[in-house]
UniProtKB/Swiss-Prot annotation:
HAMAP family: Ribosomal_uL3_B. The lineage of its organism: Bacteria, Bacillati, Bacillota, Clostridia, Eubacteriales. Coiled coil: none annotated. The keyword Ribonucleoprotein applies. GO terms for biological process: translation. The gene is rplC. One of the primary rRNA binding proteins, it binds directly near the 3'-end of the 23S rRNA, where it nucleates assembly of the 50S subunit. It comes from Ruminiclostridium cellulolyticum (strain ATCC 35319 / DSM 5812 / JCM 6584 / H10) (Clostridium cellulolyticum). InterPro entries: Ribosomal_uL3, Ribosomal_uL3_bac/org-type, Ribosomal_uL3_CS, Transl_B-barrel_sf. This is Large ribosomal subunit protein uL3.
């Protein structure tokens, strides 16, 4: 059964298992989410739910986004996300979804987030390209190097690794394990590291791979 959740990255810490081994975990505040809309095969051609996350003042939303909440008379939400699920019969508009409703300890999940932005960077930092000599009068240290032949083909090939914007990309880490779910504080402890800065928005889904 497909499961999905929105969350906010809190940070990393470590816990001990029953054998006394240290487990590095990332703490994620998952939900609570509010069901804003239900989509069905009859009306939309597929089954899905649209959820909202983090209440926000009306003045901070655009008119199109506000319109989605005015129809259902729900409080405005900062984030809206649609999840296609196999069975939406258990969800109703206005219903609150908590972390414990979706995931349990031992579940395998995929986590997607936006990586930290690094700005404009050169090829050494962006791709790990080797630097030139630092001594003996060399003027070539962290430069690009050759970008191709001159006369033939006389152009730079597509995909050539060049300086440019680094980071701020959607990254998905697959097959992570849920170590613990704190239902009182809506926290999920996930084994290992996940992308994004502290406070970054995350999409958590049950894994698409078996992990064998």
């Amino acid at each position: 059964m497909k499961k999905a959740m929105l969350g906010k990255k809190i940070g990393m810490t470590q816990i001990f298992d029953e054998n006394g081994l240290v487990i590095p975990v990332t703490v994620v505040e998952a939900g609570p989410l509010t069901v804003v809309q239900k989509k069905t095969v009859e009306t939309d051609g597929y089954d899905a739910i649209k959820v909202g996350y983090v209440k926000v003042a009306e003045k901070k939303l655009s008119k199109p986004n506000l319109g989605q909440f005015s129809k259902t008379k729900l409080a405005p939400m900062k984030h809206l996300k649609e999840f296609r699920l196999e069975d939406i019969s258990g969800f109703e508009v206005g219903q609150e979804i908590k972390a414990e409703n979706m995931f349990q300890s031992g579940d395998k999940i995929d986590v997607s987030g936006v990586s930290k932005g690094k700005g404009f960077q050169g090829v050494t930092k962006r791709y790990g390209q080797r630097t030139g000599p630092n001594t003996h009068g060399s003027m070539y240290h962290r430069r690009i190097g050759s970008m191709g032949s001159g006369t033939n083909p006389g152009r730079v090939f597509k995909g050539k690794k060049l300086p440019g914007h680094m980071g701020r990309e959607t990254i998905t880490v697959q097959n992570l394990e849920v170590v613990r779910v704190d239902s009182d504080r809506n926290l999920i402890l996930i084994k290992g590291a996940i992308p994004g800065p502290k406070g970054g928005l995350l999409v958590i889904k049950n894994t698409v791979k078996s992990g064998k």
